[in-house]
Amino acid sequence: MKNSSIVLASASPRRSELLESAGIQFRVVPADINEEPLPGEEPVDHVQRLAEGKARAAAELAEGRFFLGADTIVLCDGEIMGKPKDAVDAERMLKKLSGVPHEVVTGFAIYDRERKGAVVEAVRTKVFFKHLRDEEIRDYVATGCPFDKAGAYAIQGGAAHMVRKIEGSYTNVVGLPLCEVVDALRVIGALGN
């Protein structure tokens, strides 16, 4: 699965690690775009729009043929949770997630410069948190881990003990639905098979 024409439009170390774990060769060219939701925008439309925007923005910055963009949010009781603004926001998010199921939604887009088109998908995973004590939340926030993660937690890190179960893709919760991304890369010819 080697192909140097794949560009990851993300600075996320977790997304890089996931692609590396699949044996995919790629370069990283982070793309910075406005991530504010549009008025009335549905969550799935939001992450898909941002993913495609990041992929196309990276194509303006770098050589290559295939540009992979992604965006992840957490949905809980109708609230779209991105990355927390500060410790108070992180604690608020974790208190809201405590003891209730929520969804992690990742949109990804693979922009093909040669064909001037993109494959855009979204994957949803249901996550069930245990009830969290205030002390647990404060201790976790104090580690600094929540600040660059949607919903203020990392399932693969210090928040693993908070999760009772998931329904769907584990790698989606980490930040990139690897099965679906690899399948899409293969279908559009980015992996050469």
Swiss-Prot record:
Alphabetical list of CDD domains matching this protein: Maf
Q: Where is this site: Important for substrate specificity?
A: R14, T72, Q156
- Does the keyword Ion transport feature in the UniProt annotation? no
Q: What is its EC number?
A: 3.6.1.9
Q: Which UniProt keywords apply?
A: Cytoplasm, Hydrolase, Nucleotide metabolism
Give the residues annotated as active site: D71
User: Gene Ontology cellular component?
Assistant: cytoplasm
What catalytic activity is recorded?
dTTP + H2O = dTMP + diphosphate + H(+); UTP + H2O = UMP + diphosphate + H(+)
Q: Which PANTHER family match?
A: BIFUNCTIONAL DTTP/UTP PYROPHOSPHATASE/METHYLTRANSFERASE PROTEIN-RELATED, BIFUNCTIONAL DTTP_UTP PYROPHOSPHATASE_METHYLTRANSFERASE PROTEIN-RELATED
Primary role:
Nucleoside triphosphate pyrophosphatase that hydrolyzes dTTP and UTP. May have a dual role in cell division arrest and in preventing the incorporation of modified nucleotides into cellular nucleic acids.
Output this protein's name: dTTP/UTP pyrophosphatase
What organism is recorded for this protein? Geobacter sp. (strain M21)
